[in-house]
Amino acid sequence: MIQYLNVFFYDIYPYICATVFFLGSWLRYDYGQYTWRASSSQMLDKRGMVIWSNLFHIGILGIFFGHLFGMLTPHWMYAWFLPVAAKQLMAMVLGGICGVLTLIGGAGLLWRRLTNQRVRATSTTPDIIIMSILLIQCLLGLSTIPFSAQYPDGSEMMKLVGWAQSIVTFRGGSSEMLNGVAFVFRLHLVLGMTIFLLFPFTRLVHVWSAPFEYFTRRYQIVRSRR
C-alpha cells in the first residue's frame, strides 16, 4: 500500500496537477474572463492592506523563483561557481527569510479577510481555503530547514532536485529518488503540487496576468486642452 501511494504521489500525481494547472487555466481564460481578476479588497479597507500585501508578495515571489532556480537548474550550470553545500546554505537562509515574510504577510491578509466585515462579505470560500493552504505550505517549508541542516553537504537537497528534474524531463521512476527523504519534505511536495491543482479554480490565476509589459511600454504623452 505504501509503495502504491509512493508511486501515485511522486510519479503520477505531478502530471495530474500539471495537466489541470495548464488546461484549467486555459479554459478559464477562454470561458471565464470575467472571473479572471485579483479581486483586490484595498478599496474596501486600506488598514494593514499595504504592509501585509507587500510582505506576502515579496516573500512568495522570492520563494517561487528560488524554487524555480534551485529545483530545475541543472547542476552543471552552476557547479563551477556554486558548490552544493553553499547552494543549500543560501536556500536555507534566503528561503527562510522569504518564508517568514510570506507567513507574516499571509497571516495578516487572512486575519483581515476573516475579521473585517466588509472584506469578509466579498470573500469566497476558495479565497479562504487557498490562503490557508498557502500558509500551511509555508509552515511546512520553514519546518524543513532543521532537517536540511542535518545534511550540510546538500545530499538531501539533491535528492529533491533530482526528483523535480526527473519529473519535468519525463523520466520514469522519479519516486525512487526520494528514498530516505524525511516525511516533511514529502508532505511539502504533495501540498505544493496540490496548490497547482487548485490554481485554476482560485483568484491565483491573476498571476498569469502580471503586467510585465509595463516595464517595456512607451511613455504616455499627456497633453492638456488649452
UniProtKB/Swiss-Prot annotation:
The free-text note explaining how the cofactor binds reads: Binds 2 heme groups per subunit. Heme 1 is located at the cytoplasmic interface, heme 2 is located at the periplasmic interface. Electrons are transferred from the periplasmic to the cytoplasmic heme.
An example of a Gene Ontology cellular component annotation for this protein is: nitrate reductase complex
**Cofactor(s) for this UniProt protein:** heme
Q: Which residues bind heme b 1?
A: 57, 206
Any GO BP: anaerobic respiration
Q: What residue intervals traverse the membrane?
A: 5-30, 49-71, 84-113, 126-149, 184-199
The annotated subunit structure for this chain is: Dimer of heterotrimers each composed of an alpha, a beta and a gamma chain. Alpha and beta are catalytic chains; gamma chains are involved in binding the enzyme complex to the cytoplasmic membrane.
UniProt protein name: Respiratory nitrate reductase 2 gamma chain
Q: Which organism is it from?
A: Escherichia coli (strain K12)
